[in-house]
A protein has these predicted regions:
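Hydrophobic alpha-helical transmembrane segments of integral membrane proteins
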Residues: 80-115
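Alpha-helical transmembrane segments of multipass membrane proteins
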Residues: 14-19, 62-66, 96-100, 125-133
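Alpha-helical transmembrane segments and their helix-start/interface "positive-inside/aromatic belt" motifs
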Residues: 1-14, 76-92
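Alpha-helical membrane-associated segments of multi-pass integral membrane proteins
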Residues: 7-8, 106-155
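Membrane-water interface at transmembrane helix exits
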Residues: 19-30, 66, 70-75, 108, ...
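Canonical alpha-helical transmembrane segments
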Residues: 54-79
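N-terminal signal-anchor transmembrane alpha-helix
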Residues: 1-62
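Hydrophobic, aromatic-rich alpha-helical transmembrane segments
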Residues: 1-5, 44, 48-53, 82, ...
Length: 155
């Protein structure tokens, strides 16, 4: 019973790494590349960027935790051959993480230069967090469901 709790803590730690390290690094990148217009200052724009980046990471983290909870305690495993059928569920949670990018894309104010770089950051954050968390810490019964997990995961 200890291993699932450790895996859930590890998933949360991946999310914390994204909150603590990735968003500030992207914020500095935006500070040096993005050029705003007369309607909004760079500090206001960066504040909006950080808000929507944090929102996307939170949604991706919740999706990864729900995948773990479903795989560990909800899905019944009677045949190992049928474990790969849950890939559609994993793809559904991945879709939730991807769709969390949309509010940031729509509600981040337009800027004069390099504004679309925020979109790239939103997508990389959400996909990176969800994929890494599920690749490394999926439940044992479904640990090979994420793509390329057979090449990475040996525990």
């Amino acid at each position: 019973m200890v291993k699932p709790i450790v895996f859930m803590i590890a998933i949360v730690m991946v999310g914390v790494i994204f909150f603590v390290l990735v968003i500030p690094a992207e914020d500095q990148l935006m500070d040096s590349w993005v050029s705003t217009g007369p309607n909004i200052t760079l500090d206001e724009w960066r504040e909006v960027f950080r808000l929507w980046a944090q929102f996307g990471i939170a949604v991706a983290l919740v999706a990864a935790l729900f995948w773990f909870l479903c795989g560990q305690w909800i899905f019944g495993m009677t045949r190992w051959i049928k474990a790969n059928n849950k890939r559609w569920v994993w793809l559904g949670f991945l879709l939730v993480a991807v769709l969390a990018v949309v509010p940031g894309m729509v509600l981040t104010p337009a800027v004069q230069e390099w504004g679309r770089l925020a979109w790239v950051c939103y997508v990389v954050n959400n996909l990176g967090l969800f994929y890494l968390a599920t690749l490394l810490f999926s439940p044992s019964s479904f640990k090979y469901v994420p793509w390329l997990a057979m090449r990475v995961r040996y525990w």
